[in-house]
Amino acid sequence: MFSALKKLVGSEQAPGRDKNIPAGLQSMNQALQRRFAKGVQYNMKIVIRGDRNTGKTALWHRLQGKKFVEEYIPTQEIQVTSIHWNYKTTDDVVKVEVWDVVDKGKCKKRGDGLKTENDPQEAESELALDAEFLDVYKNCNGVVMMFDITKQWTFNYVLRELPKVPTHVPVCVLGNYRDMGEHRVILPDDVRDFIEHLDRPPGSSYFRYAESSMKNSFGLKYLHKFFNIPFLQLQRETLLRQLETNQLDIDATLEELSVQQETEDQNYSIFLEMMEARSRGHASPLAANGQSPSSGSQSPVVPPSAVSTGSSSPSTPQPAPQLSLGVSSTCPSAPSPVPSLEAMPSSVHSSAPAPTPAPAPAPAQRRSIISRLFGTSPAAEVTPSPPEPAPALEAPARVQNVEDFVPEDGLDRSFLEDTSVPKDKKVGAKGPQQDSDSDDGEALGGNPMVAGFQDDVDIEDQTHGKSLLPSDPMPSKNISLSSEEEAEGLAGHPRVAPQQCSEPETKWSSTKVSHPQKKRAPTRGTPPWSDGLTTDDSERPQEGKDKQVSSESDPEGPIAAQMLSFVMDDPDFESDESDTQRRMGRFPVREDLSDVTDEDTGPAQPPPPSKLPGAFRLKNDSDLFGLGLEEMGPKESSDEDRDSKLPSKEKKKKKKKSKEEEEKTTKKKSKHKKSKDKEEGKEDRKKKRKPPRSKEQKAADELEAFLGGGAPGSRHPGGGDYEEL
């Protein structure tokens, strides 16, 4: 039976296994499982008894909240279920088990196949779960006795069974089939008279009579309230058991107190002796850790002003030879029951090998251990052994005052840190250095285990500093702009960002040859709306002469500045290529005239290929500054070569330059021809590599005069930087 009950109140079985549950058993409701999972305080058992066909199973279903079934299906075995019920509005979790009891069960063997023959002996051999097999009143808290008011023999069953009910169990006699009252044969007065005259011993439980109808749920509310009596009775029994347990606990405690009164713990003289013995037993192990067991002082009272940062550093341990007498005279705040100082060194000396693995120390070393004793704190228990304890014992005895005493590395340095007395630094510099964990060791040599304020370089500091370089303006390249040109550059568009020099530095010698071509570029590309147009036009003859007489020491400053002013004044300069190179620029110093002007210079007479040095320019079609080259490149190259060879024809050159400026303004309107101009510019750059170097020596004086005239490039250019590299 108990195994069946465990299966009943256990976890719900899978739906596929419901068919395997034997008769009389069922799975528990999910809501009940969640409620009972928190813990059940009371288990109440209600038994429904009665003759056949009196409505026991109908009541059992109704208590579960199920519907009423008209047809009669005889119950073969006892059925048990749990229902929702609680006493009024209390929070007590009550598990109510309702038993549908069958007096005589019939267990039928269920076979998989068809029944072929009758075998009554086999059927009788199996036991059924019924009232004959179980004692249904065991641990029962309430009984519902049912009968049919239309059948007399059902009431006779009640008359037979009521005397068998235990006297302490409350009983509710329920007359069912109240909906068929016109056919009733048992009157309510007959039942009440029988209950009143029932012979029950005094102190027995209660009997109540009620009528019900399972068809229309009449009487269920009364029955629901009747369950309060079994519950309150169960609660009283539980409380009585708790009271009994409480009384037993009181008696046991009184007996323990009587025994405790006679023990040694209640004898004061014995208690004092035990305390003294315990204090002597704990003296030596605690002294090794730097504590005095009988006294509450764990470190000497040292004025904070007597300790400086340098003397409190872990690198300068200072022993105190005469500290034992000084501390005893200058520390009245320590508790009085301190052992005598004569007995203290002996106890400390006996436990000295624990913190310091050195051999037996000398008397001078013993005093240093005493200083070590008073200098330690509870923190010393965590790290009892310093890395180098030996130098502390061998240090000379020079401290003459308690104010000069410095505790050892057991104390927290921040506790006594003060910078008011700088004289301790002299004494601190003489002691050997020791490693420690404190952060005050920067006074002498720094503590390797503690980082400084900014020892680690943040990654953000490096990335920000590097990313800001390409966005710097051009004056960082030793190229200055006039005030007019700077105004145009700021009003028109952003300044030119430094461009990355993608050529190797090993081929820099070729740029010395290309200096004359660099000077010629501004004369061709300067727009007519530039403010510096008159200055550029007035200097055209000198530039024509510079092509022939420029030397390797040519400063290149004026031409570079003019080229830069032209580029910054050009509204069509904002190209994708320039934006890409502005983002890619990593070496802003590399931005020099070689990158600025070689791709925009006018075409020159192609020298013999044998004189060409190693290729320095890029082999791509890209125009760094987004400037369109004219289709008249070959014609201009021939004209400019003729002009460079004939420096006397300056007027003709001015006319040519004005014509080129007009062509430049027309070309800016048609940007779709830039790709074709880039190809021509690439061919022209290959032709202009080698100008005559013998004519470069004549340009120094004229460039100085040109610089003195207030040219925009008065500052020394960055070409010298490349030569130095």
From Swiss-Prot:
Residues 666-675 have a biased composition (Basic residues). This is Rab-like protein 6. GO terms for molecular function: GTP binding. GTP binds at residues 50-57, 100-104, 177-179. It comes from Mus musculus (Mouse). Residues 499-514 have a biased composition (Polar residues). Belongs to the small GTPase superfamily. Rab family. Residues 652-690 are annotated as: Interaction with CDKN2A. Residues 291-325, 343-353 have a biased composition (Low complexity).
